[in-house]
Amino acid sequence: MAAGKEIRGKIKSVENTRKITKAMEMVAASKMRKAQERMRAARPYSDKIRNIAAHLSQANPEYTHPFMESNDAKTTGFIVVTTDKGLCGGLNTNVLRLLTTKLKDMQAAGEDAQAVAIGNKGLGFLNRIGVKVAAHATQLGDKPHLDKLIGPVKVLLDAYSEGKIKAVYLCYTRFINTMKQESVVEQLLPLTADRMQPDKTEHSWDYIYEPDAQTVIDELLVRYVEALVFQAVAENMASEQSARMVAMKSATDNAGSVIGELKLIYNKTRQAAITKELSEIVAGAAAV
């Protein structure tokens, strides 16, 4: 029964793996709910800043900000948001594939790129393909704080304000629902018209500025862009936990199927061994 013992060992090994993937699925489900709550909590903040900044900009068209103006630089910046850990299906692969397509188009046009990496997976990828990483933020944990993101992101924002890069793109995975996430590479700077469009349901107020309109608009636009980046990180984390939960559930289900197949093979092997022993006993008795 050497073969039977070997199969029993395989069954035990797969059962242990199934316990691990089941535990990871349950942990991911718990983290996913919390990540979704943080993602939803961040949206009203960025929406309110957008409304106020849009109203101020429309009421004071004589004021401009570098974030709303284009330039002729030959370098494009990317804020690449990925995960620190794996085991989340094709989440990182999909967004990095979109980024690669964008980089190839830029290379064909003779343009350069530099990036800020948020997450270990994106940082490793950018280093492998030779894209200049101006700054990075990793090991953000399950509760990302804006303070940890501002420093690295500010590197690209300052470069854009100084006219050193012509655009900044935000690469991340947008959360749609538990079973669906969408990889996106969207323009962050210069701010497009749709990003600066006030909510139609909001009242149009007359504001009193302190110290002045230009200072308020400048501060709000910086906070708004930072909020957009934070929102992308929050959505990416919700997507990560959803993808990990689905991946671990699939692994658990597959492990169950493998165990069933191995048990069937074990039973057939055991049955064949018993039949062989009985045949030998009968043959021996007949010889006597």
Swiss-Prot record:
InterPro entries (alphabetical): ATP_synth_F1_ATPase_gsu, ATP_synth_F1_gsu, ATP_synth_F1_gsu_CS
Keywords of the record: ATP synthesis, Cell inner membrane, Cell membrane, CF(1), Hydrogen ion transport, Ion transport, Membrane, Transport
UniProt entry tagged with the keyword Ion transport: yes
Membrane-spanning parts: none
Membrane topology: Peripheral membrane protein
GO molecular function, one term: ATP binding
Cellular component, GO annotation: plasma membrane; proton-transporting ATP synthase complex
Primary localization: membrane
GO biological process, one term: proton motive force-driven plasma membrane ATP synthesis
Disulfide bonds, paired cysteine numbers: none
Subcellular location: Cell inner membrane
Family: Belongs to the ATPase gamma chain family.
Oligomer status and interactors: F-type ATPases have 2 components, CF(1) - the catalytic core - and CF(0) - the membrane proton channel. CF(1) has five subunits: alpha(3), beta(3), gamma(1), delta(1), epsilon(1). CF(0) has three main subunits: a, b and c.
Entries under HAMAP family matching the protein: ATP_synth_gamma_bact (MF_00815)
Function of the protein: Produces ATP from ADP in the presence of a proton gradient across the membrane. The gamma chain is believed to be important in regulating ATPase activity and the flow of protons through the CF(0) complex.
Protein name, entry field: ATP synthase gamma chain
Organism annotation: Polaromonas naphthalenivorans (strain CJ2)
